[in-house]
């Protein structure tokens, strides 16, 4: 009803005796607008809710084939943060299954070494992508002037998002364990307990990330990003590689 009052046009001409009625209608119209905007604000997803939705989508998409060689089909525009988040979780999901495969006790030395190289490349891709996401945040908050007493966080937003992506994977696979038909009741019970803890951790981490972003946006915290500077993949810093030159 309030929304209808807001949408209904106010008469342009009226008698002086109608002033009170018009003011009353205008008050209702502004109040309806306030409620409408408040409802829109309440319905807007937080950043981490958006992340978790995208992470779950990537995990589901991967498990359609459940094959580490499945080509990615990223549904988001290449310039968007959603594209980076989807790619991040896809890399994490593939690497999760790399880690399963390499622990096969019957894997041949050749296949194991090949898989180890793929894991190394995946780790580097993951690190590069996290740094891209941090660059997004730095650009997003580039106009924010930190308050004089602003503090720094223990990790950058993107590395916290990295942990959130891994948590989504843990929750997915732990839930799988609770639904196994070939497992004992004791196994199912333990996995359900672990699943509850993981879900609580996801809730807490999501809140912490959203609070961190709010603090950065309002100048209470500031970003300071350190590149990972991994050495084992760099031929100039890994002694096994540079000594063979």
Mark where each language-model region is:
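N-terminal amphipathic/hydrophobic targeting modules at extreme N-termini
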Residues: 4, 10, 16-23, 42-44
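Anionic, Ser/Thr-rich low-complexity intrinsically disordered regions
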Residues: 44-245
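Short, positively charged and aromatic/hydrophobic N-terminal segments
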Residues: 23-25, 30-36, 41
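Generic signature of intrinsically disordered, low-complexity, basic-rich segments
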Residues: 6-7, 15, 28, 54
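Compositionally biased non-globular segments, especially hydrophobic aliphatic-rich helices
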Residues: 13-14, 35
């Amino acid at each position: 009803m309030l929304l209808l009052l807001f949408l209904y046009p106010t008469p342009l001409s009226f008698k002086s005796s109608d002033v009170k009625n018009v003011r009353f209608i205008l008050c209702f119209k502004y109040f309806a607008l306030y409620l409408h905007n408040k409802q829109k604000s309440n319905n807007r997803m937080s950043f981490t809710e958006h992340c978790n939705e995208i992470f779950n989508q990537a995990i589901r998409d991967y498990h359609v084939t459940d094959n580490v060689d499945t080509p990615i089909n990223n549904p988001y525009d290449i310039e968007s943060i959603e594209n980076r988040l989807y790619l991040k979780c896809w890399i994490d999901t593939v690497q999760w299954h790399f880690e399963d495969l390499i622990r096969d006790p019957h894997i041949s030395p050749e296949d194991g070494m090949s898989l180890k190289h793929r894991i190394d490349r995946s780790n580097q891709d993951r690190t590069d992508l996290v740094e891209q996401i941090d660059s997004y945040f730095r650009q997003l908050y580039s106009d924010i002037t930190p308050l004089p007493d602003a503090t720094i966080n223990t990790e950058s937003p993107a590395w916290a998002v990295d942990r959130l992506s891994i948590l989504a994977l843990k929750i997915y696979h732990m839930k799988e364990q609770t639904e196994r038909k070939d497992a004992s009741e004791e196994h199912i019970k333990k996995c359900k307990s672990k699943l509850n803890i993981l879900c609580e951790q996801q809730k807490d981490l999501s809140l912490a990330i959203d609070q961190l972003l709010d603090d950065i946006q309002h100048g209470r915290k500031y970003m300071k990003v350190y590149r990972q500077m991994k050495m084992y993949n760099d031929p100039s810093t890994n002694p096994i590689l540079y000594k063979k030159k």
